[in-house]
């Protein structure tokens, strides 16, 4: 035991010796050529660990006081702490007698014991200053390092004169750098996020507005720039204690709020402790690397919480951030022994609880409540799937004589150009599934989107998005078929499991309107970093021998980690040969896929077969990939088979997409909700009798069952009209300002691998199981009261609806926590929005009238002046001519 104490307890004087110490037999000497980077964030834990030498590299450490050394249990473990405290005097005498094993000197124990506390404190201050300089250097290198960027984009900032200026904003951990240009050459200012709060701000202008402010109305600006600039570029004056910022779109604004919420918590780049879950990220492996990755910066935000998280402010004390009083200069300047002892007691407590680092767990990952079993919907693998053949064979159908009579009966009810949405179609042309189900055909290759989310090059991201878009068309039924028109309130749920990333892509759809027929859908895979939402208005036009099914609306694909939105449209379906010829179904129209943030876009043209064209002209497609107006590549081929891409720069042509049998084999497997757990208005259960009759080829029974469903829908509509009730959707809501349908429980936060555990779905609500519950930063597009699904969300899950807290004094309007919107549309908000629009229109009208009156009043005077001038010039010319004639006469 005495030997263990001698080998394991470095005396305070031993730490004053040379850096090349002579260690005991149980210690391995570190390579002196390897630079050992020691950060202030790791000083406290290394002081505890190095008091007990283990077979690891030995670093020169700052000296410890006797109180911290005595509180350490050395090699004996936590169970001997009390005994070690009783024998503290004995261990100190033995360690001092053998201190020459550590400092390599020939001084005896009496000489080493004469070291005064003043000398020890001097060494501590020296080490403190060195670590402080190193931390400051690392912070400055992070600010100037172009690779360490959380987010960067153009934002509009309101000045003190209430005018907006477009500036380039670069978000880094703990700071927001503002430049005049994108080249980061003209620095405007640096916002210190450590003392800032962020809140959404209502605004009449377009885009998304939020406010960054100091709660105590103090300055949020740094004194100097990232390169030591004392004066920033000349712009309009900006407020000192707050910034009002406006993004171009709501999705960009929400992404900025999420990123700022993370960045303002990252007041220290360096962490004092390292949790077990973070060891695989090489935080302690490469000690000679000072490069800080974006992933490490973001994960530092969630590593610690509560009282055990003490910020390392050594690198930002000079700029006067929040006063943490943790190893501050003021406390170091005082030579009060009681103050030193209090510091050492804190260190001792941390050492006592963290003796064995491998067994330590961070408090952030300790759930105070018992882990509850995950309550999620049961999904079953889809047993049967129909894939039609490529080409024209699977898109044509010969109508029997019996069905022709039904078609002629139908044609008597319609006229050319008529909308067929209210016409009851015969069941023999129905595909035995709902239109909500058919919209899910685009996600059997959702793994392409997972790859696109990881792609760094925006051009390659666009190519993968286009490839995914084309992958949704080759799955088609055999023959000419049309899916069921969904019943109002009908829903459909399914998911796909990604084997490579061990994630799930969830698909939720609901029929939100019957007249006009609108289907809303939402797709989410937060772990892989993408979500997609949209709504489709189905229209159909009759042209005599043909009809077209037009899908109006757009889908919005969002990459969560990048804040990019790809807006895309849909082609229309064209059926010809109704009266004569072979009935054929084709796709036609122009599709646009546009990313406003990057400037990249794609144009795809689905071509109809010409009247005299061969089978090679069936299902043709052509397209362009563009950056602005510049065409980067062209596409040619068939949307259900090979598509070739031709690069304009290299003029090389290669296969871009081809649904070969191998591709179809590796497509993701769809899982649908277990039939017993489905709601009565879910597609499979709602249409089960009609589907059963169609599969049995009993058209009479199918027509009867279809009529029962449609009549029940009409009766429900009449009842609501009698009671003056409005239909309230279950999962989606309408934005009265934009007219878009949004999923009520959307969660567009980037995936946090340290806090987010698994994404799951229950009762149509897509949620995330988390290790540590934190309030969500993102705010829903419309506030509403918690629905039945929200009340079922248990603590420990990521709730799609955030808690809205009161704002303190900096805003004139405070948001009450209980302010939630009822189901459906709040008439009060709609009325206020309409009044705001009316006021804006009146103001515009007044401005137009004033401008017109000004023009009318100024035009005659101008014309009169011009006429007088012309007359005067003519008179002078005539007079000059007369004088000349008189002289030469």
Swiss-Prot record:
Residues 73-88, 95-109, 116-129, 321-336, 346-363 have a biased composition (Basic and acidic residues). Gene3D superfamilies: 1.10.287.2720, 2.40.160.120, 3.30.70.3490, Pleckstrin-homology domain (PH domain)/Phosphotyrosine-binding domain (PTB). Widely expressed. Most abundant in liver, spleen, kidney, brain and adipose tissue. Keywords: Acetylation, Endoplasmic reticulum, Lipid transport, Lipid-binding, Membrane, Nucleus, Phosphoprotein, Transmembrane, Transmembrane helix, Transport. Residues 781-794 have a biased composition (Basic residues). The modification N-acetylmethionine is found at residue 1. The modification Phosphoserine is found at residues 14, 65, 68, 314, 328, 342, 807-808, 810, 814. Disruption phenotype: Mice are apparently healthy and show no developmental defects nor gross abnormality of glucose or lipid metabolism. However, they display a significant elevation of plasma HDL cholesterol and phospholipid levels. They also show a modest increase of APOA1, plus a number of mild gender- or diet-specific lipid metabolism phenotypes. Deletion in bone marrow-derived cells, including macrophages, reduces atherosclerotic lesion progression. Residues 148-265 form the PH domain. It is found in: Endoplasmic reticulum membrane; Nucleus membrane. One of its GO terms (biological process) is negative regulation of cell migration. One of its GO terms (molecular function) is cholesterol binding. InterPro entries: OSBP_sf, Oxysterol-bd, Oxysterol-bd_CS, PH-like_dom_sf, PH_domain. A 1,2-diacyl-sn-glycero-3-phospho-(1D-myo-inositol 4-phosphate) binds at residues 420-425, 482-485, 514-515, 706, 710, 714. A 1,2-diacyl-sn-glycero-3-phospho-L-serine binds at residues 420-425, 485, 540. Disulfide bonds: none annotated. Residues 62-71, 805-817 have a biased composition (Polar residues). PANTHER family: OXYSTEROL-BINDING PROTEIN-RELATED, OXYSTEROL-BINDING PROTEIN-RELATED PROTEIN 8. Belongs to the OSBP family. Lipid transporter involved in lipid countertransport between the endoplasmic reticulum and the plasma membrane: specifically exchanges phosphatidylserine with phosphatidylinositol 4-phosphate (PI4P), delivering phosphatidylserine to the plasma membrane in exchange for PI4P, which is degraded by the SAC1/SACM1L phosphatase in the endoplasmic reticulum. Binds phosphatidylserine and PI4P in a mutually exclusive manner. Binds oxysterol, 25-hydroxycholesterol and cholesterol. This is Oxysterol-binding protein-related protein 8. It comes from Mus musculus. The lineage of its organism: Eukaryota, Metazoa, Chordata, Craniata, Vertebrata. The gene is Osbpl8.
